[in-house]
A protein has these predicted regions:
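Short alpha-helix
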Residues: 1-4, 193
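Residue-level detector of anion-binding/catalytic polar loops
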Residues: 6-7, 112, 141, 205, ...
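Core SAM-dependent methyltransferase catalytic element
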Residues: 12-41
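Short beta->alpha connector loops
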Residues: 14, 122-124, 147-151, 174, ...
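Radical SAM enzyme [4Fe-4S]-AdoMet core and its adjacent flexible, acidic
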Residues: 17, 29, 89, 166-167, ...
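Flexible mid-to-C-terminal extensions adjoining Fe-S/redox cofactors in radical SAM and related proteins
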Residues: 17, 39-53, 57-60, 84, ...
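Conserved alpha-helical substructure of the radical SAM core
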Residues: 42-166
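Cysteine-cluster motifs in flexible loop/terminal segments that predominantly coordinate metals
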Residues: 73-76, 80, 266-269, 275, ...
Length: 328
């Protein structure tokens, strides 16, 4: 048993009950109620997992936040896993009180996660930049993931004044405007590059995010050269057989990895959880699947029971297999 954990009495022999030791949770599967000495060998009828406060905090290295519903967007990208579009009507908007409650839960477990604001299109939220100011003022590192169409010089300037912003990730599928706009919509290549230029001119780090597919694979090398020219990085995102991609029968690029090149420590679900529409999920990919919901509170989402559920999901869910085989 790890140092710092002493004898505790299990209040009730069932899964995920808090013990009298505030520094630990004990997951106990036992035939009957009994005091348990955590330093003593376990009987064959018992199985325990002890997670100290520092371990819980470590399990929350990333926290994905959807300021708007995943399907709320000003674009209708051909491969969107949420089938987001301007036609979608979901009134959910993250409130200031909701964000405050969320941060209180983070602080309660002494975690220092990296926040990732994503969507849908997060810049559609009228208070987004106020929320980013709150995160920045508290000293949390964070990033913004956007299609770039609503990043103007004024907003780029505001972002440049946030010292804990690590980068802005902008979706761009090809260095060829025709290919890019066939995926996102007419004129969007130019608008995305305008956002990149506005941010880079103000010293904001930028990553260009592309999803390798049959339709854009030949232009990816040119995209990498464009990124170098703009002083940006490139991130490749896996194509999931969900949402619009599934409806259209899109296929990943033939050059995309088909080998298991991911360790568990690099998976999104191993680094944290996603928060969307008032609930927590294993990752941003699964936030529209009610069966994967981990709970309404951070304690529930990070409990041993939830971690076991996530481990099982990895083995059976098709989206998890995509993450295991490719980049996330």
């Amino acid at each position: 048993m790890e140092a710092g954990f002493t004898r505790v009495e299990v209040l009730e022999v069932s899964e995920n009950k808090r013990t009298r030791n505030p520094e630990a949770y004990v997951l106990t599967l036992s035939a009957k109620k009994a005091p348990i000495d955590l330093r003593a060998p376990l009987r064959k009828t018992q199985k325990q997992i002890v997670i100290g406060r520092e371990n819980v905090a470590e399990s929350l290295r990333e926290l994905w936040i959807f300021p708007v519903a995943p399907e709320t967007c000003n674009l209708a990208c051909t491969h969107c896993l949420y089938a987001a579009s301007p036609r979608t009507r979901n009134p959910y908007r993250l409130s200031g009180d909701e964000l405050s409650r969320l941060l209180a839960q983070v602080e309660a477990i002494d975690a220092k996660p990296h926040f990732l604001f994503t969507g849908g299109e997060p810049t559609l939220h009228p208070e987004l930049y106020d929320f980013l100011d709150v995160i920045d003022d508290k000293g949390y590192s964070f990033q913004l993931m956007t299609n770039g169409t609503r990043i103007q010089k004024e907003t780029a300037t505001r972002l440049s004044k946030m010292p804990h912003l690590t980068k802005v990730q902008i979706s761009l599928e090809s260095a060829d405007p025709k290919i890019n706009d066939s995926i996102y919509g007419a004129g969007l290549y130019k608008r995305a590059l305008g956002a990149v230029d506005s941010l880079r001119e103000r010293g904001v780090a930028v990553t260009l995010a592309a999803t390798p597919m049959d339709c854009n694979q030949e232009g990816l090398a040119d995209l990498e050269r464009l990124a170098v020219e703009k002083g940006a990085d490139v991130k490749y995102i896996s194509l999931y057989d969900l949402g619009s991609a599934k409806e259209r029968g899109l296929k990943p690029s033939r050059g995309a990895s088909d080998g298991n090149n991911q360790s568990d420590s690099t998976l999104m679900c191993d680094k944290g959880v996603a928060y969307s529409e008032g609930a927590f999920y294993p990752c941003p990919v699964l936030v529209k699947e009610p069966s994967t919901k981990l709970g309404d509170t951070l304690d529930e989402a990070l409990s041993p029971e939830s971690r076991q559920r996530v481990a099982k999901l990895r083995k059976v869910h098709s989206a998890c297999q995509v993450c295991l085989k490719g980049s996330t």
